[in-house]
Curated annotation (Swiss-Prot):
Name this protein carries in UniProt: Bowman-Birk type proteinase inhibitor B6
Disulphide bridges, residue numbers: 5-60, 6-22, 9-56, 12-20, 29-36, 33-48
GO BP field: negative regulation of endopeptidase activity
SUPFAM superfamilies per the UniProt record, alphabetical: Bowman-Birk inhibitor, BBI
Annotated organism of origin: Hyacinthus orientalis (Common hyacinth)
Family statement: Belongs to the Bowman-Birk serine protease inhibitor family.
Keywords noted in UniProt: Disulfide bond, Protease inhibitor, Serine protease inhibitor
Biological role: Serine protease inhibitor. Inhibits trypsin (Ki = 30 nM) and weakly inhibits chymotrypsin (Ki = 550 nM). Does not inhibit bacterial subtilisin.
Xref: InterPro entries: Bowman-Birk_prot_inh (IPR035995), Prot_inh_BBI (IPR000877)
Length: 61
């Protein structure tokens, strides 16, 4: 399937096709996120805390 976009990838593993933790705060976690955490910033936002495959980069739509 299509990989979810991540503007700011944090820690990534060192494999050839790296899995990363996405630092983005989003209105809802992408389908397939295994560890979705609610982050309260005044409005409820979510962050996926599991290592997943992403398209990383600042211009990702």
């Amino acid at each position: 399937g299509r990989r979810p976009c991540c503007n700011e990838c944090g820690i990534c593993d060192r494999s050839l096709d790296p899995m990363c933790i996405c630092e983005d705060l989003v209105p809802q976690c992408h389908e397939g996120c295994q560890a979705c955490e609610k982050v309260d910033t005044g409005t409820p936002m979510y962050q996926c805390r599991s290592f997943e495959y992403y398209h990383c980069g600042p211009i990702c739509y």
